[in-house]
Amino acid sequence: MSRKILLVAACALIDADGRILLAQRPEGKSLAGLWEFPGGKVEPGETPEETLIRELDEELGIQTKEACLAPLTFASHTYETFHLLMPLYVCRRFEGIPHGREGQAIKWVKPNALRDYPMPPADEPLVATLRDLL
């Protein structure tokens, strides 16, 4: 069966204490209540890095630059109606204080506590890679 391929870029924001920022999917969206790495859909003509710069500003009110985004790994996961490809970047340098601009809860989480936050199936395999990095 042929499924649409959806390209989404995600970012593991890491603070000075080595914690990772998670955002909770708001009510009314698919997978509501689950925690995820901030990011969003790559629009036509946009690179994943451009997507993250835009989405981090829109969703969290923070600014970063392409040079501050380091590609780490990616997720490839088949959902019922589409296949998700999601590069995950790490960002340690950004300006501003993250806050949920779209009504979503956010939380800084120690790497060893990431498993305590229910995540979408595509995000779950990324946790081990991040724990190994930090």
Predicted regions and their residues:
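A short coil-to-beta-strand element that immediately follows conserved catalytic motifs
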Residues: 63-73
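Conserved Nudix-box catalytic region and its N-terminal flanking loop in Nudix hydrolases
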Residues: 19-58
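Active-site-adjacent beta-strand/loop module that shapes the phosphate/pyrophosphate-binding cleft
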Residues: 6, 15, 73-97, 107
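Conserved N-terminal beta-strand and adjoining loop/helix that marks the start
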Residues: 1-20, 41
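Generic C-terminal helix-cap and adjacent flexible tail
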Residues: 1-3, 131-134
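NUDIX/MutT-family hydrolases
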Residues: 88-90, 98-130
